């Protein structure tokens, strides 16, 4: 199974450390977090994209995806007035451009919290409008867009497989896909494999973590409560051939290399020998 490193955990170090560690530790690809100081889309547009492309070449590390920060700090396409919405969409479009230029496999976004007082019809109307515009843009430049479901601790919009199905039905674009961060279904008592059953070939990517079942905290495999060995067997048996990003975020960023090594070793130990 192909593995990806998420660069978010390296944000207090130069981004070259993330590429170097991904290469030396044996990851198969890298998922670029689009936040400062590493790969914020406007900074890439201003010239930083050259460094990202050079690092990918130097370390022979495929960029499997680009994940701009869209969960509300400061960009959230689901909350705020029209000026805020417009600014968020413009940033995501720029991120799609930068993903294309760095030869990323996809641009990954999420629908962050829409606010406690927003009624469902307004939430879904706004989501449909946003996704329609973004998908049209992605179609025009030839970039796949992945919508990530979040946990209920993070959002009240797209949080489970049925929400994803609703979003895909609202915007039936050939460039729109989804994925599963396995923490999200686990904390909601939703079977992870239901995503495979419901989404079929629209399931494009995986984020692998462990979970305590009661928060959105992302743990290294083996530190939580998930039956990961059994889950990975089912995923492999289902014929999944995409990347699995071991998504360490901010919990381990004091020693990102050490934990990235530990996470990869533990993850591969969960797999049958011919899949490691």
From Swiss-Prot:
Residues given in the record as a divalent metal cation binding sites: 148, 181, 207, 247
The protein's Enzyme Commission number: 5.1.3.41
Needed cofactors: a divalent metal cation
UniProt xrefs under Pfam families: AP_endonuc_2
InterPro entries: IolE/XylAMocC-like, Xyl_isomerase-like_sf, Xyl_isomerase-like_TIM-brl
SS bond list: none
Molecular function terms, GO-annotated: isomerase activity; metal ion binding
Isomerase is among the record's keywords: yes
UniProt superkingdom: Bacteria
Residue numbers annotated as active site: 148, 247
Subunit organization: Homooctamer.
Protein name according to UniProt: Fructoselysine 3-epimerase
Species for this entry: Shigella flexneri
